[in-house]
Amino acid sequence: MIAIFLFYNKTNGFQSIFSTKGIKHCNIICYDGQDFVIFGLEEHGISFRRIKAKSTLKIMRNIKVIESLIGMIVVHVDEPKKITWKPFWVRSCNELCRYFSGVDIGFTFNPYHLIKKLLKYNNKRNYQVLSVWSRNNGI
């Protein structure tokens, strides 16, 4: 599975008070071989939408026009880790991204912590980082 982690410098959620380094929010696009689906934490719950695109490269190129997007990490997940859903434990954007992708990195406190763990455990767990992009050294 391909997972594209997207990081933003704007949000309207209260969890942003725990964010650091100007990285306030994240969401994820997953590709399972048939469909691209974007998942995100919205004000009133979890949202997901199918994206019609011919390739991961097209999505990466076109999504960069979003002004608040400051970084992107693309990973290939070999075998998604089965993570027990704990809805009352944490409902943050970074944890939802971790759940949906199946990356084996353990708990993440905020989007910045998610970035650090994705880069730290590259090729050491169940995924490989394929690409890292940032706007003005965003990540």
Regions found by a protein language model. Name each.
Residues 1-139:
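Cysteine-nucleophile amide-bond enzymes
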